[in-house]
Design a protein with these regions (language model features):
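Extracellular/periplasmic ectodomains of large secreted or surface enzymes and adhesion receptors
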Residues: 175-176
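Short, exposed beta-strand-loop hairpins at the edges of beta-sheets
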Residues: 155-157
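M16 family metallopeptidases and their MPP-like homologs
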Residues: 1-16, 24, 37-145, 163-171
């Protein structure tokens, strides 16, 4: 397994940035899939995501990961870092943002019809965090307002080569 991580902030009080990071991770994931799966053929399902703590304001991360042969892990890690570096220096394209936002908006619409979203995500914590109600009300408008400039600024801020944590997990050799 090859894993690349970059520290971000948490979710608490920072939901607008987390929404933008969600789209950035989607763009990064598409680039991982195109390069690692389609061009290199080194892994079937590379992916990316973002996670932020609700309890710790300064704890969150962007992650890219891919399962591959042990002999390919260094190549996978280099590819992950190179793709993040390119996003940081050259930015994403309008087409990439469009491809990231359309499925997200579709998912948002689906959750509006699900009790699990309203009860589990919004209402269950709204008494201790009343802002959740407003976040639920404005999430679609907020996603639709996200600009390419915002995404590219986040890529520059977080995808710094010197702050990348690259991890590979390999099976033990037979002699161990």
């Amino acid at each position: 397994v090859a894993i690349s991580l970059w520290q971000t902030g948490g979710v608490r009080g920072n939901q607008k940035e987390m929404r933008r990071l969600n789209l950035l991770s989607s763009i990064y994931g598409d680039r991982l899939r195109e390069e690692i799966r389609e061009k290199l053929g080194a892994s079937y399902s590379p992916n990316a995501g973002v996670s932020g703590s609700e309890a710790l304001e300064d704890f969150g991360y962007l992650v890219g990961q891919s399962v591959g042969k042990p002999e390919d892990l260094d190549l996978l890690l280099k590819t992950m870092r190179d793709l993040a570096d390119t996003l940081a220096t050259e930015g994403a394209t309008a087409d990439e943002l469009d491809r990231a936002i359309k499925p997200t908006l579709g998912e948002l619409e689906q959750t509006l019809r699900q009790n699990s979203y309203w009860l589990g995500t919004v209402l269950s914590k709204s008494q201790q965090d009343p802002a959740r109600l407003e976040l639920a009300r404005n999430r679609e408008a907020d996603y639709k307002s996200i600009t390419l400039e915002e995404i590219n600024e986040l890529a520059k801020r977080y995808f710094k080569a010197e702050s990348a944590l690259l991890v590979s997990i390999k099976p033990a050799s037979p002699s161990e």
